[in-house]
Amino acid sequence: MYSFLFKYIIIGDTGVGKSCLLLQFTDKRFQPVHDLTIGVEFGARMITIDNKAIKLQIWDTAGQESFRSITRSYYRGSAGALLVYDITRRDTFNHLTCWLKDARSYANSNMTIILIGNKSDMESKRAVSYEEGRQFADENGLIFLETSAKTASNVEEAFVNTASKIYEKIQKGDFDINNESFGIKLGAPTSKQDGTDQKPAGGGCCK
């Protein structure tokens, strides 16, 4: 059982490592070659915040323009979004404004968004500086982390920090937690240790 269920969506261009981040978080493993995500795929895991069991239900979306309308339908009913770019591909960073505009147009206004610069293990091929990522996040009111789905660096933190922010908003009364359109569902008021459950399907990590 869980105290709360939080729904997440992972967004960003094709090939930035969205599916790899999900797999690393739910299964603690890295799969370098995936088929492209077609539409939307799913994973879930339990975490603990403030001694409360929280289930994260995570939707991994396709980055291709042809699937954008499907992705948009998943913004509604999401409490958190991971907006991902690839630090070795500047075009994926340049497209963030478009992704963010979509998120803020179609999601509820209280959705927590974290900006993730993925593939931090590929420092020698870096095309976007840490400072640029931080500046974009600061200017747009986002949480910011650089991650590596390959080494697992900051992957746990990305998902958990987002959940902590959502939980903080619940404590402040920013959400009507009885309205599931905010991406939050009440469970049983019990506490639980960290664990894992459903495995995600593969997809969409690499071009």
From Swiss-Prot:
Top-level lineage group: Eukaryota
Pfam families from the UniProt entry: Ras
Compartments where found: Cell membrane
E.C. no: 3.6.5.2
Region (Disordered): 187-207
Gene Ontology MF terms: GTP binding; GTPase activity
Activation and inhibition: Regulated by guanine nucleotide exchange factors (GEFs) which promote the exchange of bound GDP for free GTP, GTPase activating proteins (GAPs) which increase the GTP hydrolysis activity, and GDP dissociation inhibitors which inhibit the dissociation of the nucleotide from the GTPase.
InterPro entries registered for this protein in UniProt: P-loop_NTPase, Rab_GTPases_membrane_traffic, Small_GTP-bd, Small_GTPase
Binding site for GTP: 12-20, 60-64, 118-121, 148-150
Gene Ontology BP annotations: autophagic cell death; Golgi organization; hypotonic response; phagocytosis; regulation of response to osmotic stress; regulation of vesicle-mediated transport; sorocarp development; vesicle-mediated transport
Motif (Effector region): 34-42
Membrane topology: Lipid-anchor
Keywords: Cell membrane, GTP-binding, Hydrolase, Lipoprotein, Membrane, Nucleotide-binding, Prenylation
S-geranylgeranyl cysteine: lipidated positions: 205-206
UniProt enzyme class: hydrolase
Catalytic activity line of the entry: GTP + H2O = GDP + phosphate + H(+)
GO cellular component terms, A-Z: contractile vacuolar membrane; Golgi apparatus; Golgi membrane; lipid droplet; pathogen-containing vacuole; plasma membrane
Function according to Swiss-Prot or TrEMBL: The small GTPases Rab are key regulators of intracellular membrane trafficking, from the formation of transport vesicles to their fusion with membranes. Rabs cycle between active GTP-bound and inactive GDP-bound states. In their active state, drive transport of vesicular carriers from donor organelles to acceptor organelles to regulate the membrane traffic that maintains organelle identity and morphology.
PANTHER family: DRAB11-RELATED (PTHR47979)
Name this polypeptide is given: Ras-related protein Rab-2A
